[in-house]
């Protein structure tokens, strides 16, 4: 096992951090409200949260939806939300086995869809919404197995 000169091997396991390839960290101005909103509207399950010992406020939480995990944390006081900026700099995509069912649940909460449920040219069935602070979320399901060159992309590897 490689350790690259550190005291900890790279393949170390940590039950507090899932083994996803990427663990997105999403900042919210009102973190407790955001956690409740993500649970209610998207179906996330809160795994744990932790408190800032100086303020006594929730500082971060790990949330899970299907096989995806995120860390939600409190933003800095002077940080703007995507909603305040009028745009989001990135999106988060979560994959489902049944995106239709998730789409029906999300629509039933009254959220405005940014992108209606549709099949993409690259073989995904997906839709998109913005959360309460303007972060862009895409919910997707593999609908077809397509090679990138089948829909016009140039394979470069």
Language-model regions: role of each:
Residues 28-32:
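Short acidic-aromatic low-complexity motifs
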Residues 2-25, 35-36, 42-97, 103-130, ...:
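Vicinal oxygen chelate
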Residues 133:
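C-terminal catalytic core of tyrosine-transesterase DNA break-rejoin enzymes
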């Amino acid at each position: 096992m490689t350790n690259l000169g550190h005291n900890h091997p790279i393949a170390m396991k940590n039950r507090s951090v899932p083994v996803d390839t990427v663990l997105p960290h999403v900042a919210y101005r009102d973190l407790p409200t955001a956690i409740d909103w993500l649970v209610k509207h998207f179906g996330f399950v809160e795994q744990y949260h932790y408190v800032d010992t100086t303020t006594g406020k929730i500082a971060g939480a790990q949330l899970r939806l299907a096989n995806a995990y995120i860390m939600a944390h409190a933003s800095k006081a002077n940080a703007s939300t995507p909603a305040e900026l009028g745009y989001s700099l990135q999106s988060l995509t979560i994959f489902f086995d049944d995106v239709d069912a998730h789409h029906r649940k999300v629509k039933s909460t009254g959220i405005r869809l940014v992108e209606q449920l549709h099949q993409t040219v690259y073989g995904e069935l997906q839709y998109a919404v913005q959360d309460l602070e303007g972060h862009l979320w895409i919910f997707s399901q593999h609908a077809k197995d397509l090679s990138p060159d089948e829909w016009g992309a140039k394979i470069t590897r």
